[in-house]
Amino acid sequence: MAAGPTTATDGRPPAPTGAASRRLALGALLVVLVGWSLTGLDVTVDRLLGAPGDSWDIFRRMFPPAFAEAAERGVVGKVFESVHIAWIGTLIGALVSLPLAFLAAGNVAPAWVRVPVRQLFNVIRAVPELILAMILIPVTGLGPWAGALAIGVHSIGTLGKWATEAIEGIDEGPLEAVAATGGRWASSMRWGVLPQILPVVTSQWLFRFEINVRASAVLGMIGAGGVGSELVSQLVFRNFPAVGAVLFMTIVVVLSIDTAGP
């Protein structure tokens, strides 16, 4: 009697499909990339195994936090200076990015305008706030103004992209209604688009403000205002109780802003 066709039930695994082969190749590529990255970072097994213990030792030395010493050094004022930097930077980003977003959205702007504005957003997002602050410090001098401008410029790229996506996701009905009444482009944006995107864009601004508070603390490390300069100073002298106080106050402020948000 002739043997029937061979099936997967014969005990042999089925031949790998194209999708399975691609997943296997992708997994192998990821393993190679991780190994290559670790080699480039000069990471050794001893350092990896010792990292948890070293981190715990530093964390333990931060307690109890030296709140009295931090208050004497004006850390509270520096923390709120970081908040002020973040607020001004977010305001700059919001005011500039929203009009540009109308020029970048594919459903309301022509390609000859849309493409350059989108590329502008991409270029801005490609430069970190830290680099922007280093570029601006020779112009503005050391202090919070450089930090606020750096955060503001970077926020334009991020908020502009988010607002563009919000505009492209609107209901086209109100736009058609305004156009049917003879309204021009500006009227369509004012009455057909803005009411739809404003709740979303407002929440994006608040979210970006939370991010900017954390970014402003980092900018202080290069002299761009905020609490970062005090944090670096205490780390250099290995005054970990004071470092703990600075970090605690910064975390409390960030959590308070997050709780107060929508």
Locations of the language-model features?
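Alpha-helical membrane-interface segments at transmembrane helix boundaries
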Residues: 76-84, 117, 121-124, 206, ...
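Transmembrane-helix boundary motif in ABC transporter permease subunits
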Residues: 88-121
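Membrane-cytosol interface at the C-terminal ends of specific transmembrane alpha-helices
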Residues: 142-208, 262
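C-terminal transmembrane helix and the adjacent membrane-cytosol boundary/short C-terminal tail
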Residues: 203, 244-262
